[in-house]
Amino acid sequence: MKVVKICGIKTVEAASVAIDNGANLLGCILVPNRARTIDLEVAKQIARMVKRDRNPPPKFAGGTSTQHFEQVAQWIIENGPFLVGVFRNQPKEEVFRIAREVGLDFIQLHGSEDKLEFLGTEFGLIPRYVVPDELDLLEEQSLSLTQCVSLPLLDSEVGGEGKLLDWTFIEKLPTKAILAGGLTPENLPTFDNILGYDVSGGVETNGVKDSLKIIKFIQKGHAQSS
């Protein structure tokens, strides 16, 4: 089974659909002044919903560096759902303050910030790497990322814009990761080194989360196998 992340959630209703249908990760945009930026009070409500829908997860035990991301993905599948807050080039102190206030499980870094500065906290880490420009950086940082509960994300430059990646680069990926970038329920690729799928616009209709598309994406994502 692959990890499925529904991102850009702004409402309790969309979160409820994602949780009830087995999404492993729910993503909320906490970058100011974006179309999908969530109200902090709504984010707190969703954090409570996520925690109510799971047992207290066991501490991630870690493992070999070569299998680390695979083990993190399996831990997420077995113990989720988890709430992810998406940040972009925001001060580290602000990121951690908001993460603690909301009650996040994971921090997703979507800008040019130094990902390694965010290691060693109580939060899991989902660092975004631009394909193909930052694949060398991912290879360089992958060993350091195994120091925490982390899962790399491959995406386009900004993300959330529905732009498909050039999947020929995925086949040559030096490590395992989750995939974003223009995904829909109809176009999920299967690669040995892809551990999951991240979607936002691909489950929307006219800019609003579409329950039927969310359900279909989760079903299709979980049905994919390496």
From Swiss-Prot:
GO molecular function terms noted in the UniProt entry: phosphoribosylanthranilate isomerase activity
Annotated Gene3D superfamilies: Aldolase class I
EC number: 5.3.1.24
SUPFAM superfamilies membership: Ribulose-phoshate binding barrel
Sorted UniProt keywords: Amino-acid biosynthesis, Aromatic amino acid biosynthesis, Isomerase, Tryptophan biosynthesis
Amino-acid biosynthesis listed as a keyword: yes
BP GO annotations: L-tryptophan biosynthetic process
Catalysis performed (reactions): N-(5-phospho-beta-D-ribosyl)anthranilate = 1-(2-carboxyphenylamino)-1-deoxy-D-ribulose 5-phosphate
Involved pathway(s): Amino-acid biosynthesis; L-tryptophan biosynthesis; L-tryptophan from chorismate: step 3/5
Name this polypeptide is given: N-(5'-phosphoribosyl)anthranilate isomerase
Gene (name only): TRP1
